[in-house]
Every structure is written in structure tokens, then in C-alpha cells.
A protein has these predicted regions:
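Conserved ABC ATPase signature
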Residues: 208-212
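Conserved beta-strand-loop-alpha-helix hinge in the C-terminal portion
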Residues: 37-60
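Helix-to-loop junction immediately C-terminal to a conserved catalytic motif
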Residues: 132
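The feature captures the beta-strand-to-loop junction immediately N-terminal to the Walker
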Residues: 117-119
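Conserved ABC ATPase "signature" region
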Residues: 187-204
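H-loop/switch region of ABC-family ATPase nucleotide-binding domains
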Residues: 17-18
């Protein structure tokens, strides 16, 4: 709605994006970049007519979410142990602000993936930072594997991936970032090399993290999560 409103005002919009579906009926043209160059320009009608093979060749995502299929996976057994339990957790940013979180309770089992969704400002990031021990709750309890945890204990067991990936880099290269905090054995080196290659980042291993594109930075943080020995990972 905001983009349409800007378009009606006569604004010129240039969007740098991977996701195309919400632009299908807004964009006039789609320009495809690769290797630092604009490789092709297509009208909206031409882009909509791309086959799946053409999109894959151009590294484009679908314009129609109905085309996306999600592979089925076996449901977790109901007896799977609880990894994380949040009980009546409350949090406020100040006396005048009122409760940002008011009595939040839920549990997550081991090996379970949960998507926490909601509008901007509803408290998603706040609850994530509480679980990671970055904030101290004003009430309630957070338990990991059946044991109550204080913020310091949570920090040792929960990895929190920020929205702003660059705030989590501390070394001078992609490879050193993945090795940071680990005992670098030959086995770990082989694992890291395989991971970098699987994420199409092997050629970037000696680059400074800040020189990466936004998408590459996000991939680096995901690789850091994969190599982490922390049992709980929160992706903000």
C-alpha cells in the first residue's frame, strides 16, 4: 500500500530486492543484475511469463506464491522433550511506557522450528532478546530443558541472530568469523570448507565481512549459527 501511494504521488522508485511476488502488480520493469552488471531488462508482463527454468537461470524468485511447495516432514512425536518454556514473561522499557510484553507463555520442543509472526512493534524482537538473555524480564520465568535460567545462563545457551547482520561480525575475514570461538581442528576446517562451498561462499572466505553484500552477510550469520554449539537459535 505504501509503495502504491508513492507511485500515485509520481515518485520514481528503484527497489533492490530478491522477493518479487509483492512487486508483480506494482513494478513497471524488472532489471536483472549479475557480476556487477545489469544483464537484462524485462517488462512486468515478460517477467510474469518466465518459466521456472528461466527464473532459475536468472536466479530469480517466483512472482506467484501459489507456485511454492513446502516439502512435508514427519511431525515431532508428542513425547519430544521441551527445550524452551516461557511462562508469564513480562517486560517494560520504562514506567511510562507500560508493558511491552504482558504475560507471554509458550513452549518449544527439541528439534522444533517455530515461526513467531506479528505486526511491527508487537514484541517479537523483545521476546527473542529476553530468551537470549540480552534483556532481563520484569516478571515471569524462562526455562531451558526443564531448568530455570537467569540472563547469564541464557547467553551461554541461546544464539540470537540480529536483523542487522553487520553488528555481529568481529574479525577481519569470513573464514575467521566462522572460526571465532571454536577450536580449529582439521575436522572443523573440513566442515567449515564444506559449509562455505554449499552456501556458495568459498570464494569469499578471505574477504572482510563488511565487504559482503547484504544477502551474503545474512548467509554468513546463518553459517555461524550452524557451527554454533548453542542448542537454541533465534533468527530475528
Amino acid at each position: 500500500e505504501i509503495l502504491l501511494a508513492l507511485k500515485k504521488q509520481g515518485k520514481t522508485l528503484l527497489l533492490s530486492e530478491h522477493r518479487l511476488y509483492y512487486l508483480a502488480d506494482i513494478a513497471d520493469e524488472f532489471w536483472v543484475m549479475a557480476d556487477g552488471e545489469i544483464k537484462g531488462k524485462y517488462t512486468a508482463a515478460e517477467a510474469k511469463a518466465f518459466s521456472a527454468e528461466q527464473r532459475q537461470t536468472l536466479s530469480l524468485r517466483t512472482l506467484d506464491l501459489a507456485e511454492i511447495t513446502v516439502p512435508e516432514k514427519e511431525p515431532l512425536p508428542k513425547t519430544a522433550p521441551t527445550a524452551l518454556a516461557v511462562s508469564d514473561v513480562r517486560y517494560t522499557y520504562g514506567r511510562k511506557a507500560g508493558d511491552t510484553l504482558s504475560g507471554v507463555s509458550f513452549s518449544v520442543r527439541e528439534h522444533e522450528i517455530v515461526g513467531l509472526v506479528g505486526a511491527n512493534g508487537c514484541g517479537k524482537t523483545t521476546i527473542g532478546k529476553l530468551i537470549a538473555g540480552l534483556y532481563r524480564p520484569s516478571g515471569g520465568r524462562i526455562m531451558l530443558f526443564g531448568k530455570p535460567q537467569n540472563p547469564k545462563q541464557l547467553q551461554k545457551q541461546v544464539l540470537f541472530i540480529l536483523q542487522e547482520a553487520e553488528f555481529q561480525f568481529f574479525t577481519g575475514s569470513v573464514l575467521h568469523e566462522l572460526q571465532y570461538g571454536h577450536v580449529v581442528t582439521p575436522e572443523f576446517e573440513a566442515k567449515t570448507e564444506a559449509l562455505l562451498k554449499s552456501m556458495d561462499m568459498w570464494d569469499c572466505r578471505d574477504r572482510h565481512p563488511f565487504s559482503l553484500s547484504g544477502g551474503q552477510m545474512q548467509r554468513l550469520t546463518l553459517m555461524m549459527a550452524y557451527l554454533s554449539d548453542k542448542p537454541i537459535v533465534i533468527l530475528d
